[in-house]
């Protein structure tokens, strides 16, 4: 796990390729996908993440109609409502979902390093008439496949089985922790999960409804890495020493943005 490195900062604020933070990749994807309203939900050590998010103009999004919102658990003298899982973190911020007007929601983990046009996932979601679309990735290296939710899919892309962190499996396609779902359906599923004292998005929504709802997998064929362990965090940073990886992220459209606070030289461009 990442406790050795993340005991003083959120994983989403961990440095990647020098100047970047892990969350920059997901937020850049959202900016490039023209998403106007973004909520960042964080549990522990939020200060460094908040400083990072507030320091860059690239995260302004659409302030008139949307904007960037950061939510942490509500801690009072009477109670401490720590998030008990991804579904619970969304449920505890239900008011944000209910006050929004957008028909669809993109849920994305802050510890993934990748490029993705979420509009393409949404288009796929609509074409398939899916209830939930999961962005999936085929792993060539299966040594750490037990860290992920492993999925079985039909040729048409429908997910027929989801095995969360299996000890053994012959499958190699995993969930990246990126989902597209209609907002009203998400609210309905979260409220149902809360009524039943269920808190995990994968186990208590995806697995629970895999045979009831139409869940499809959108295949991501480009670079993707998850930095939730020390080994994967090290390997991801080592990947950026490779020219093809650097060129893919920093020389090919769309851009990856970062905050000026992390640039050491004033003459260096803020958009790479």
Where are these regions (language model features)?
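Conserved beta-strand scaffold positions in the cores of enzyme catalytic domains, especially
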Residues: 13, 67-70, 215-217
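Catalytic-core segments of class I nucleotidyltransferases/pyrophosphorylases
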Residues: 98, 102, 106, 113, ...
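Residues at the starts of beta-strands that form the adenosine-phosphate
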Residues: 36-37, 131, 214
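Catalytic cores of nucleotide-enabled group-transfer and carboxylate-activating enzymes in metabolic
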Residues: 7, 12, 21, 27-33, ...
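Conserved beta-loop-beta/alpha segment of the NTase-like Rossmann-fold superfamily
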Residues: 61-155, 180, 188-192
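N-terminal glycine-rich phosphate-binding loop and ensuing alpha1 helix
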Residues: 1-58, 64-66, 77-79, 96
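Residues that form or immediately flank small-molecule/cofactor binding pockets and catalytic motifs
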Residues: 18, 73-75, 137, 164-167, ...
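Single conserved hydrophobic/aromatic residue that forms the stacking wall/gate
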Residues: 261-272
């Amino acid at each position: 796990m990442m406790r050795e490195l993340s005991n003083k900062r959120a994983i989403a604020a961990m440095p990647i390729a020098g100047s970047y933070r892990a969350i920059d990749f997901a937020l850049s994807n959202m900016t490039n996908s023209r998403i106007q309203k973004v909520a960042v939900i964080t549990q522990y050590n939020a200060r460094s993440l908040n400083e990072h998010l507030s320091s860059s103009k690239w995260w302004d999004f659409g302030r008139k109609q949307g904007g960037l919102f950061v939510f942490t658990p509500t801690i009072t003298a009477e109670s401490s409502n720590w998030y008990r899982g991804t579904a619970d973190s969304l449920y505890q911020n239900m008011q944000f979902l209910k006050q929004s007007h957008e028909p669809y929601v993109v849920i994305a983990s802050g510890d993934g390093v990748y490029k993705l046009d979420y509009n393409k996932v949404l288009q796929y979601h609509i074409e398939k008439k899916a209830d939930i679309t999961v962005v999936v990735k085929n792993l060539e290296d299966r040594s750490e496949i037990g860290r992920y939710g492993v999925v079985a899919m039909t040729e048409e892309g429908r997910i027929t089985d989801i095995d969360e962190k299996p000890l053994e499996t012959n499958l190699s396609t995993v969930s990246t922790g990126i989902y597209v779902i209609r907002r009203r359906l998400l609210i309905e599923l979260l409220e149902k999960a809360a009524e039943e004292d269920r808190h995990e998005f994968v186990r208590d929504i995806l697995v629970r409804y895999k045979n009831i709802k139409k869940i499809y997998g959108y295949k991501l064929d480009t670079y993707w890495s998850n930095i939730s362990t020390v080994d994967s965090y090290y390997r991801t940073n080592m990947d950026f020493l490779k020219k093809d990886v650097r060129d893919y992220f920093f020389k090919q459209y769309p851009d990856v943005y970062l905050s000026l606070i992390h640039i050491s030289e004033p003459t260096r461009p803020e958009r790479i």
